[in-house]
UniProtKB/Swiss-Prot annotation:
Organism superkingdom: Bacteria
Cited function: Catalyzes the synthesis of GMP from XMP.
Active site (catalytic residues): 86, 181, 183
Identification of the protein by name: GMP synthase [glutamine-hydrolyzing]
Keywords from the UniProt entry: ATP-binding, Glutamine amidotransferase, GMP biosynthesis, Ligase, Nucleotide-binding, Purine biosynthesis
Residues annotated as binding ATP: 235-241
Species name: Baumannia cicadellinicola subsp. Homalodisca coagulata
Reaction catalysed by this enzyme: XMP + L-glutamine + ATP + H2O = GMP + L-glutamate + AMP + diphosphate + 2 H(+)
Lineage, top ranks: Bacteria, Pseudomonadati, Pseudomonadota, Gammaproteobacteria, Candidatus Palibaumannia
Alphabetized NCBIfam families for the sequence: guaA_Cterm, guaA_Nterm, PRK00074.1
Glutamine amidotransferase type-1 domain boundaries: 9-207
Quaternary structure note: Homodimer.
Length: 526
């Protein structure tokens, strides 16, 4: 029997917090389904979602600003527990009769200690240490506004030396506010506080597990598609790979995958995909060799944004050409869209933020094929997709490979993209990755790759002078790829990689290491 994984559900309202997606992931890690919606959600939408509990996220605005976001009044009449985090706590206070002020002497950014001064189901028996018989929580604060008086029927549960209302509660209505961020790892007991709210106070059941998700998706595909045929663009990345396997388990030979070799892939990528999917997994795959077509289109193009758009447009055109030959039999187009793509796409429609780079995962495939769309992963985060991949029997090394951008080497070769440059870069990148594996560092860094720079440098090989290309190595460590630190790889390791690249690859005279964080730099160079 397939369990209903959506029986228990938490609704998280986004007030603009940089940690909003992380908050969703933390709840799902508890085995409970939840969704992130905009703060201005309507009463009808809340009723339709029917949450067991509601969490109000933090946000960058001041609650004192005119027209600053407010929660729907219905939230406080829905009869379910509510937890306000940072800004979410402050809007609860204002909307229910409390007061908020901005006191520069009481603002807190970074580490703080919350002293628990009253018993509450939210924090009972949860502490990092005890001082004078009082439990203490080590937390992460990020606020300028402060509550100066709490609403009627609320009590103070916790305080810091500068914030007298760090945790507040209305136990009768099960309304709670915390001034700190439980979703970040810096708040040591954040997991336990969220667990207490979600599982105990909201009485949710933990049915959101990788195996249950897998079985539900496969069953849903069978019901949705039936005996009809599906076409999928297969890239070899995690999302399209897991999508292909879910469809394969659900509809078998009725799935046809299209793999486009654009000449911008990693070393032996195309042959590895053919080996894994066609021979080992018996998927029906159409292979399209299009290297010459992509390189011709990229000839003379130096602007990175233009390169991204050309690669995306050409991929879409070639996919459409191949898919049209299947439209007599196929009625569905599958995509490996994941939940962050949906969230970011929705945000972009209302955001005034400047586009830093074109995103290569959203809206990339043609909508002119008159095929129905199926997106099996659209409710999942990347870490959930990987866990489902393991449930499907896919190898760990395939699922946990470092991210590879949609435009491929096209944005790791700075300037014009040529075949000989792709070959140089592939070899350098392979050496870097090989040595990371040998040193057992590959899974300790979040992403690592080589970049071919558009400059030449003088070198000496034996008694001869050479004037050849420069490679930059890039390795970063990150949790969410929104921010990243450069990896402090040892000098000995970097020397080993540099020597191998220069000695083994004809055409490289110098290797440098990128020590830029994000921000100010982006992870990819283009």
């Amino acid at each position: 029997m397939i369990e209903n994984i959506y029986t228990s559900r938490i609704l998280i309202l986004n007030f603009g917090s940089q940690y909003a997606q992380l908050l969703v992931r933390r709840v799902r890690e508890l085995g409970v389904y939840c969704e992130l919606r905009a703060w201005d959600i309507t009463e009808a939408q809340i009723r339709e979602f029917a949450p067991n509990g509601i969490i109000l996220s933090g946000g960058p605005e001041s609650t004192l600003t005119i027209d600053s976001p407010r929660a729907s009044p219905y939230i406080f009449m829905a009869g379910v527990p509510v937890l306000g985090v940072c800004y979410g706590m402050q809007t609860i206070a204002i909307q229910l009769g409390g007061k908020v002020n901005q006191d520069m002497l009481r603002r807190e950014f970074g580490y703080a200690q919350v002293v628990i001064i009253a018993d509450s189901p939210l924090t009972r028996n949860i502490q990092d240490l005890i001082n004078n018989n009082q439990p203490i929580l080590n937390v992460w604060m990020s606020h300028s506004d402060n509550i100066t008086s709490i609403p009627p029927d609320f009590i103070i549960v916790g305080r810091t030396t500068t914030c007298p209302f760090a945790i507040i509660a209305n136990e009768k209505k099960r309304f709670y506010g915390i001034q700190f961020h439980p979703e970040v790892t810096h708040t040591c007991q954040g997991h336990n506080i969220l667990k207490r709210f979600v599982l105990d106070i909201c009485s949710c059941q933990g049915r959101w597990t990788p195996n249950n998700i897998k079985e539900n998706i496969i069953n849903h595909i069978k019901e949705q598609v039936g005996k009809e045929n599906v076409v999928l663009g297969l890239s070899g990345g995690v999302d399209s790979t897991v999508t292909a396997m879910l469809l394969h388990y659900a509809i078998g030979v009725n799935l046809t995958c299209i793999f486009i070799d654009n000449g911008l892939l990693r070393y032996n990528e195309a042959s590895n995909i053919r080996e894994i999917f066609s021979k080992n997994l018996s998927l029906n795959i159409i292979y399209v060799r299009s290297e010459d077509r992509f390189l011709r289109a990229l000839a003379g193009i130096y602007n990175p944004e233009e390169k991204r758009k050309i690669i995306g447009r050409l991929f879409s055109e070639i996919f459409e050409e191949q898919a049209r030959s299947l439209t007599k039999t196929a009625t569905w187009l599958a995509q490996g869209t994941i939940y962050p793509d949906i969230i970011e796409s929705a945000i972009s429609h209302v955001s005034l933020t400047n586009v830093i780079k074109s995103h290569h995962n959203v809206g990339g495939l043609p909508n002119t094929l008159n095929l129905k769309l199926i997106e099996p992963l659209k409710n999942l985060f990347k870490d959930e997709v990987r866990k489902i991949g393991l449930e499907l029997g896919l190898p760990f090394h395939m699922l946990y490979r470092h991210p590879f951008p949609g435009p491929g080497l096209g944005i790791r070769i700075l300037g014009e993209v040529k075949k000989e440059d792709c070959d140089l870069l592939r070899k350098a990148d392979l050496i870097f990755i090989e040595e990371l594996y040998k040193a057992k560092l590959y899974y300790k860094v979040s992403q690592a790759f080589a970049v071919l720079l558009p400059i030449y440098s003088v070198g000496v090989m034996g008694d001869s002078r050479k004037y050849e290309r420069v490679i930059s190595l890039r390795a970063v460590e990150t949790i969410d790829f929104m921010t990243a630190n450069w990896s402090h790889l040892s000098y000995d390791f970097l020397e080993l990689v540099s020597n191998r690249i220069i000695n083994e690859i004809d055409g490289i005279s110098r290797v440098v290491y990128d020590i830029s964080g994000k921000p100010p730099a982006t992870i990819e160079w283009e």
